[in-house]
Each structure stands twice: as structure tokens, then as C-alpha cells.
From Swiss-Prot:
The keyword Calcium does not apply. Its main location: secreted. Glycans are attached at N303. It is an enzyme of class 3 (hydrolase). This is Probable 1,4-beta-D-glucan cellobiohydrolase C. One of its GO terms (cellular component) is extracellular region. GO terms for molecular function: cellulose 1,4-beta-cellobiosidase activity; cellulose binding. It comes from Aspergillus niger (strain ATCC MYA-4892 / CBS 513.88 / FGSC A1513).
Length: 459
């Protein structure tokens, strides 16, 4: 999976040696290349695996990326008449009782992503790219989910919910809702390498994860008057459907189920609506995978005592599939269920038959250009010929789908193309992956430019 940049950048001086280009790697565990940057760039430590050359002028403060545009919000379009029943706008109403939990709210604009665009992207849009500055500014204002991909990021949830609470108290109309991704399972990303997490099952990872969830719950209880939308553990359950032949996934199965159960039961709060990640059409939409996937999702839901706050499933997270497409691209390899609408309408009845009346959200953050440049449907890393997609809205035209959302912040890398890196995944070196690419979660300027250029609708 693919996860966002660390909370802030720490700037470290290095000795005089060969210089790395802007956005290139300049440090990290196991790295042996150039450790200084060209003029106008500064080497910024992102995490233990990666340091990146970023524009010096836009990153002089280690707190810039955390604080810029923290009060910005954007409304969610709610003009459709084909939705699930619209419920009360009260942030303390249980999601399952109030219908579509997105209706009647505007979504909080991810302040960290907004400041990445302002501090990293826009200063580099010069010369022939200067015409994209207005589009970049607009993209920064589109609400996207905040990823809680390490325990260290959990306190920022409190900062953001406090800001939302303050704006709502000041009369925000419609009231603002927060959006977060819960993403820190032990032995995370078990079928890939690019987004390995901080916890290991062998090193008390399950207990560490439960503490992580406890911290999130504490914040949600503290801000019980703020309506909060959660996506739960991208890729995790989908890996248990198709990848148990991978030793790491087989070994992680019981821990994934225990941890997911803990998350669903502990975060089952009146001000919360949760969506379990459900892969995408190119993963679980295959006819042979639909019933096993439905069986697993229904089992997880029922084993958690059918939590009222679990509204349904999230699809296409960090992926590229069309919501609907008239002709299946060649890379869908003969599967007639080749878009997210078909996938959702195929799996929903299978869930309903087992007592899980699931509704859905779809990540449209990077699916604006169709077909994409994928050579194979399973190619997921920094895929070429992609663009920003439909803006967040409840106007989906399908009663099963609560909203189109931007879960993956567009412009943050899916994984490094450096084959010598500790977390290198071969998918990031494929011919349909934009290269050279930095580590997962770090800013990838060329990819952001691609998304802007191919945005549909355009900014």
C-alpha cells in the first residue's frame, strides 16, 4: 500500500560530495548515493529509509507542512436524488441510523496535503509548467483523507478535530466532517514491500496496534461532537482473500483479523462512520473472488457484533479504476467486471444475503484518465497516464454508493523505483510506472504534474 509523508521534515547538513537532483534521494537506511543536493534544494529526512531533496525556499520551517491552510474546508455536492436516504446533519447521530453519513456535511481539507502542494509543488511549477499553478492551487483545496499510518501521527488527528470543532462552533454551514485512514496493522502490506509499517507481529505488534487504536478512540471520544469518517486498513482484508499463498500474509491472517475486530469494536462510536477497505474491481471483482470476499467481509462485520458505525466498504483506494467505463480496457484481461460500479453492484447482494447491508465509497482521486497506462491490471505503482478524477461528492447516481472521495493524496509516491532500496517493490520498476520515483509517501513532483495535466474534470 501507499502512505503519506511523515509529519514534518527535519533538515540535516551533509558533507560536500556528489549532488542529487531536486526530488532525488539523498539519504536513508542502506542508501549509498549522493547525500547533498543541487543549489536551491535541501536534503530533508522523511523517515529512517528515506531523505529527499526538496526546494529550499519552500521548506525553511520544519512545521510548514503541518500548519499551512489548516482552516480550509470544501463542500460536498449533494444534488442527486438517487442516493441512500439522507439523514440528520447531527454529528452525533450513528451512521447506520442516519443514512448516508456524508450527506449534510462539508469535508475537511487535508491541511498537510494542502501545504505539501503549497510548499513543495507550486514553487517548482516554473517556466513551461507555470500555467499549472492555478490548477495546483485548486487541487490543494480538494478534501482528501488524512492517513494515520504511524502511531506518531495520531496526535494530529486531535489537532485537526479541534480545528473542525472550532469552525463548527463558529457557525460552519454545513458543518464540517473529518476524514482519516486507519492504517498501521502489524506486518502491514503483507503481499508487497513498498509500504511496510512500523509494527511486527513477532515483536508484540498486535498489542502495539491495540494501543494505537486506543489512542484514536480517546481522541474521537474527546471530540464526540465532530462527525468523523474512517477508512479501515487498506489492502488488509483483500490480501486475506487472494494472497494467503504469500507466507507473510498467511502468517499475518489471525493477527489481521484480531486487530481489525479490535478497531471496529473500539471505534464503534456515535460520531463515527467506518468503511472497511475492499480492494477494487481488478482485485476482488473477478467472479472467482467475489463470493470469498463477501464471505470474509460479512464474517468480519458479524464477528465484531455488526457495529452500528460500520457503514460499509471503501473501494479503489489508491487505485486507478474508472467508476464506470463503456469499453473494458485490454489490461482488464477479459474480466467483464471492469469498473468500480460493476464490482460494487456484484458484491453488494452477496453481502446483503449474509446480513451486511453495506454501502460504499469510491476513491476517485487518481482515476480521471481512462484508460490508464497500465500494462496489467495488477500494476499499482505510480502508474503512467493517470489524472485527478471526480471531486468528492454524494452525487454518485447509485443508491449503493454514499460518495466519491479522495482517499489517496495525489502526488505522494506509491513506492521507490530504486532497486537497491530496502523497500523496493518490483512493480515500481515496471515500464508502466513513472520513474525515477521516490519512497512511498514522499512527494513525487513529476507524478503530481501528470495528475494535473490529465485531470478529468479539469481544474
Amino acid at each position: 500500500m501507499h502512505y503519506p509523508l511523515s509529519l514534518a521534515l527535519a533538515f540535516l547538513p551533509f558533507g560536500i560530495q556528489a549532488q542529487q537532483t531536486l526530488w532525488g534521494q539523498c539519504g536513508g537506511q542502506g542508501y549509498s548515493g549522493a547525500t547533498s543536493c543541487v543549489a536551491g534544494a535541501t536534503c530533508a529526512t522523511v523517515n529512517e529509509y528515506y531523505a529527499q531533496c526538496t526546494p529550499a525556499a519552500g521548506t525553511s520551517s520544519a512545521t510548514t507542512l503541518k500548519t499551512t491552510t489548516s482552516s480550509t474546508t470544501a463542500a460536498v455536492t449533494t444534488t442527486t436524488t438517487t442516493q441512500s436516504p439522507t439523514g440528520s446533519a447531527s454529528p452525533t447521530t450513528t451512521a447506520s441510523a442516519s443514512g448516508n453519513p456524508f450527506s449534510g456535511y462539508q469535508l475537511y481539507v487535508n491541511p498537510y496535503y494542502s501545504s505539501e502542494v503549497a510548499s513543495l509543488a507550486i514553487p517548482s511549477l516554473t517556466g513551461s509548467l507555470s500555467s499549472l499553478q492555478a490548477a495546483a492551487t485548486a487541487a490543494a483545496k480538494v478534501p482528501s483523507f488524512v492517513w494515520l499510518d504511524t502511531a506518531a501521527k495520531v496526535p494530529t488527528m486531535g489537532d485537526y478535530l479541534a480545528d473542525i470543532q472550532s469552525q463548527n462552533a463558529a457557525g460552519a454551514n454545513p458543518p464540517i466532517a473529518g476524514q482519516f485512514v486507519v492504517y498501521d496493522l502489524p506486518d502491514r502490506d503483507c503481499a508487497a514491500l513498498a509500504s511496510n509499517g512500523e509494527y511486527s507481529i513477532a515483536d508484540n505488534g498486535v498489542e502495539h496496534y491495540k494501543s494505537y487504536i486506543d489512542s484514536i478512540r480517546e481522541i474521537l471520544v474527546q471530540y464526540s461532537d465532530v462527525h468523523t469518517l474512517l477508512v479501515i486498513e487498506p489492502d488488509s482484508l483483500a490480501n486475506l482473500v487472494t494472497n494467503l499463498n504469500v507466507a507473510k500474509c498467511a502468517n499475518a491472517e489471525s493477527a489481521y483479523l484480531e486487530c481489525t475486530n479490535y478497531a471496529l469494536t473500539q471505534l464503534n462510536l456515535p460520531n463515527v462512520a467506518m468503511y472497511l477497505d475492499a480492494g477494487h474491481a481488478g482485485w476482488l471483482g473477478w467472479p472467482a473472488n467475489q463470493q470469498p470476499a463477501a464471505d470474509l467481509f460479512a464474517s468480519v462485520y458479524k464477528n465484531a457484533s455488526s457495529p452500528a458505525a460500520v457503514r460499509g466498504l471503501a473501494t479503489n483506494v489508491a487505485n486507478y479504476n474508472a467508476w464506470t467505463i463503456s469499453s473494458c480496457p485490454s489490461y482488464t484481461q477479459g474480466n467483464s467486471v471492469c469498473d468500480e460500479q460493476q464490482y460494487i453492484n456484484a458484491i453488494a447482494p452477496l453481502l446483503q444475503a449474509q446480513g451486511f447491508d453495506a454501502h460504499f465509497i469510491v476513491d476517485t482521486g487518481r482515476n480521471g484518465k481512462q484508460p490508464t497506462g497500465q500494462q496489467a491490471w495488477g500494476d499499482w505503482c505510480n502508474v503512467i497516464n493517470t489524472g485527478f478524477g471526480e471531486r468528492p461528492t454524494t452525487d454518485t447516481g447509485d443508491a449503493l454508493v454514499d460518495a466519491f472521495v479522495w482517499v489517496k493524496p495525489g502526488g505522494e509516491s506509491d513506492g521507490t523505483s530504486d532497486s537497491s532500496a530496502t523497500r523496493y517493490d518490483a512493480h515500481c520498476g515496471y515500464s508502466d510506472a513513472l520513474q525515477p520515483a521516490p519512497e512511498a509517501g514522499t512527494w513525487f513532483q513529476a507524478y503530481f504534474v501528470q495528475l494535473l495535466t490529465n485531470a478529468n474534470p479539469a481544474f
